[in-house]
């Protein structure tokens, strides 16, 4: 027998998985598909540190579709900012969805899917 508590736990786990999949699913910044998995986020942060230290910094970057782009310091910083905004948006959506699951306002996976877009 599935209890309400089981349903809430299952829906919260589903929402957490949905958040994670969206977070690591990648984004497009100025036409360049950017990977947002944990390794890629570390590489982006490293490039950002170099870009902040040297405004003339450039680096070849392999995009999520395997195309190669030479990025300037400003482009690296813009990509880093976009990735941060993407991740923060995923967390913000989950922070809105989780209490709605607990309150019963969200009672199914379709509502969670809709919240995450």
Predicted regions and their residues:
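A preference for well-ordered globular domain cores
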Residues: 1-117
């Amino acid at each position: 027998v599935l209890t309400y508590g089981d349903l809430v736990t299952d829906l919260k786990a589903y929402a957490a998985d949905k958040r994670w999949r969206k977070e690591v699913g990648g984004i497009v910044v100025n036409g360049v598909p950017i990977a947002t998995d944990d390794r890629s986020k570390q590489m982006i942060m490293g490039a950002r540190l170099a870009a902040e230290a040297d405004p003339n910094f450039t680096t070849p970057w392999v995009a999520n579709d395997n195309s190669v782009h030479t990025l300037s310091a400003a482009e690296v910083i813009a990509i880093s900012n976009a990735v941060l905004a993407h991740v923060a948006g995923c967390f913000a959506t989950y922070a809105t969805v989780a209490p709605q699951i607990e309150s019963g306002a969200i009672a199914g996976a379709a509502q969670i899917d809709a919240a995450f877009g």
